[in-house]
Amino acid sequence: MFFEIALIGTTASGKTYIANTLAREFDAVVLSLDSLCVYKEINIASAKPSQDDLASIKYFGVNLLSVNEHFNVELFIREYQKAKEFALARNLPLIIVGGTGFYLKTMIDGLSEKTLESKSSLNNDEIYTLLLNIDPNYKIEKNDTYRLKKWLGIYEQTREIPSEFLKRTQKTGVLKDIEIYELSWDKEILKKRIQTRTKEMLDNGLLDEAKILFSKFDHKLKALNSIGLKECKEYLDGEISFKELENLITIHTTQLAKRQRTFNKKFQSKALEFDKALAILRMKFSIEK
C-alpha cells in the first residue's frame, strides 16, 4: 500500500541506515534529499549509500549530476514527483530521507517566483549586514553563500523586501500532511559518532577521492568546498597536518549538525531515539501495509 514518510536528523544520525533497512524489509522506495549525493563523482565525502544499497533499493535523488553542474530545489521536486509516481504505480511505501532540511521545507511550503542569483561582488559579511538592515526577519546563516546571493538577487531585481516578496509569490507545496520523524541523539554521543565516521571516511579513501576531484574540476566549485573536501584541499596543499585534517572535519561536521538541529525545529516532527526508531517504524510500516 502506498504511503509516505519523511525521516530527518543531523548528519551521522543514522538516517540512511534506518531508511535502507525499512526499504529492504518493506520493499519501499527511497528519495534522498542530500546536496552532495546528487553528484556522481562524490561518494565518500557525501556518505552516499553503497553500490550494493543503490543496486538493491529503488533510490531517487542520487547520482544525477556531475560536480560542475548546477542544481536547485526544483531538481528534488522533480525527483519527488518521479519517486511518488513510481511508488504509486506499484503500491509501495515512499521514504524521504536526508539532512538537507531546506529542500524538505520548500517541498512542503512551496516555491516562490523565480529570481536570478545576484552577481554582486559583495562578500557574505557585507550582504549579511545589508540583510539585517533591510530584512531582519529573514533567517539565513552568515556562511550560506547561495541563499545570501539569492536574497540579494531578489532585492536587486524587485526592490521589495525579499521575505515579503517570497511570501507574496509562494506556490503550493508538493508535500501535504506528511508524517515527519526526527532521529534524536545525545549531543556528546553524536559528537563521538561524527569522530568515528570522520576516521572511517579517511580510512576508506577520502583523500584519494579529493585528489581525483581537484585534479578534474575547478576547486572553487561549490560542491568541492563542502565539509570533508575543503579540509582535504588544505591538507593536500600542505597547509595543515593529517591530525589537523581529521580534527577540522570533525569540528566542522559537528557545527553542521548543530545548524541542522536548529533548522529541523521548523518541522512538526515526531522525535525518535535512534535505538527505538527501527522498532517503532517497523510497527508503523506493518500497520500501513
From Swiss-Prot:
Its EC number is 2.5.1.75. Its cofactor is Mg(2+). GO terms for molecular function: ATP binding; tRNA dimethylallyltransferase activity. InterPro entries: Dimethylallyltransferase (IPR039657), IPT (IPR018022), P-loop_NTPase (IPR027417). HAMAP family: IPP_trans. Belongs to the IPP transferase family. The record marks 100 as: Interaction with substrate tRNA. Catalyzes the transfer of a dimethylallyl group onto the adenine at position 37 in tRNAs that read codons beginning with uridine, leading to the formation of N6-(dimethylallyl)adenosine (i(6)A). Monomer. One of its GO terms (biological process) is tRNA modification. Substrate binds at residues 11-16. Keywords: ATP-binding, Magnesium, Nucleotide-binding, Transferase, tRNA processing. ATP binds at residues 9-16. It comes from Campylobacter jejuni subsp. jejuni serotype O:23/36 (strain 81-176). This is tRNA dimethylallyltransferase. It catalyses: adenosine(37) in tRNA + dimethylallyl diphosphate = N(6)-dimethylallyladenosine(37) in tRNA + diphosphate. Residues 34-37 are annotated as: Interaction with substrate tRNA. SUPFAM superfamilies: P-loop containing nucleoside triphosphate hydrolases.
